[in-house]
Amino acid sequence: MFLINGLEQDTLPASDRAIQFGDGCFTTACILNGDVCLLEAHIRRLQHGCEKLMIPFTHWDTLRQEMCELGTGKDSGVLKVIISRGSGGRGYSAASCLNPTRILSVSAYPAHYSRWREEGVTLTLSPVRLGRNPMLAGLKHLNRLEQVLIRTHLEQTDA
């Protein structure tokens, strides 16, 4: 289930810049005993991301309320929150993008995390190197292709 701009739905316009350019930021939070862990830290992460990416998102109180509501009644889970710049015209200019999109989803807490905690993990080196861009350093932006390639390599090599 996705909550997109406050409505339960599972579709996003193809014109949304999250799809077109990976133009947005996200955070992933743990839900425990009905609460979103470190809620304010996740809000600050999103605020920082929007500020650095110059996304004019202003609905912080609404977002905070939605995050809390999605955690209510759940023993455990994972809450992902995405803020995209929203829909806009063709091309890289974001000048016409005045209505950012907020996307929230909840999923089950991964079962393998408990196993990792008990048994540990094995590390390996990836042939995929992360790019360096000081302006984006530390941001959880939507362009995660390097991480996708790293994960694909791990799966293909059984690492």
Q: What kind of region is each of these model predictions?
A:
Residues 1-68, 84, 89, 93-159:
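Helix-start/capping segments and mature chain N-termini
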Residues 78-83:
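ATP-grasp fold ATP-binding core
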Residues 75-77, 159:
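Short coil/turn segments at beta-strand junctions that form active-site/ligand-binding loops
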Residues 70-74:
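Phosphate/pyrophosphate-binding loops at sites that engage ATP/ADP/AMP, CoA/4′-phosphopantetheine
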